[in-house]
Amino acid sequence: MKIYGAETTTDEVLEGVSLQGRHFMVTGASSGLGEETVRALSSAGAKVTMVARNSDKLDAAADRIRKSVPTTDLQTGLVDLADLSSIRSYAEEYLQEDAPIDVLINNAGVMACPFMTTKDGFEMQFGTNHLGHFLLTNLLMPAIRSGQNPRIINLSSAGHTHSDVSLDDPNFETSEYNAWESYGRSKSANIHFTREIVRRYGDVIRSFAVHPGVILTELGRHLTPELMEEMVERVKARSTSSAEAKETGGLPFKSMEAGAATQVWAATTDDLEENNGAYLGDCKVGVEGGNPSENGYLPYIYNEDTAKALWSLSEQMVQQEFPSS
């Protein structure tokens, strides 16, 4: 077993690994971690379907990857995760191709935006980060289940420490909106979703939730100095790291290649067979109560009752039920 850490890069994770014959789908693939994930997987011989909502940005990212990896086998697909009709249209179109998906990487997301709603009226962060991926994943489940050793990777975050999910008020209809609390709810939802996938389909599917670390990407486009300060204070209040790390909020920045490494590791390694459903960070299995800026998590994210209830709530919100096994 190779030993990895916070500075491990995607290329180091895939050193000596052949992904020939494997098909990956990556959401949010038009920039940042998604684009780097696609580049790395392509360099190891994988076929990759890049999914994003902006056609110009998606085509530009695909062109950059083709220049970097001339032998790459890329497809693209347009999906707006803030629009359930867009998700349904894409899934219906994709399933007509009868093409198995070996690994789905739910990478797309929005962070700490001002209060706004999706096309269907859901609070934007919960609606995009969780509900959009919840619907897309379930609609694509026939293709995933027909894949070879299928996996579903959900991009979560240390941001889950800001808040657990709210089953009573997911859209902030009766409580005051806070950008970081909303982000925390959505990132906790990603983990509960992962856990419930495993409970329902773990005999066939491996699923992991991933903390990428802190990376400068388009995800931070809504961040103001005030929001950054609030984030640091929130992390410091929850950090179990050293006093020195707490002074900076325990927020070491990573390169793009290091930031995407954990999700690439989760999508490809054979070292996680005994850890199905785990929360991962720095290419390691998560540690309850550990430093959240590394691979630490709060215990509420492994609550089975919450995961079941969130699944039921999500079905109600997207107005569609899915098989339990």
For each feature predicted by the language model, list its residue ranges.
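NAD(P)H-dependent oxidoreductase Rossmann-fold/reductase module
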Residues: M1-L84, R88-S89, E93-L104, M111, ...
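Extended catalytic-interface subdomain
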Residues: I153-N154
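Short alpha-helical oligomerization interface
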Residues: C113-T128, T174-E176
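Amphipathic alpha-helical dimer-interface segment in Rossmann-like NAD(P)H-dependent oxidoreductases
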Residues: T128-Q148, D164, V198-R199
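Mid-sequence acidic-hydrophobic segments that form the walls
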Residues: Y94-E97, N107, M111, T128, ...
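Conserved acidic residues
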Residues: D102, E123, P150
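A short helix->loop->beta-strand "cap" motif at the edges of active sites that frequently abuts
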Residues: A46, G147-P150
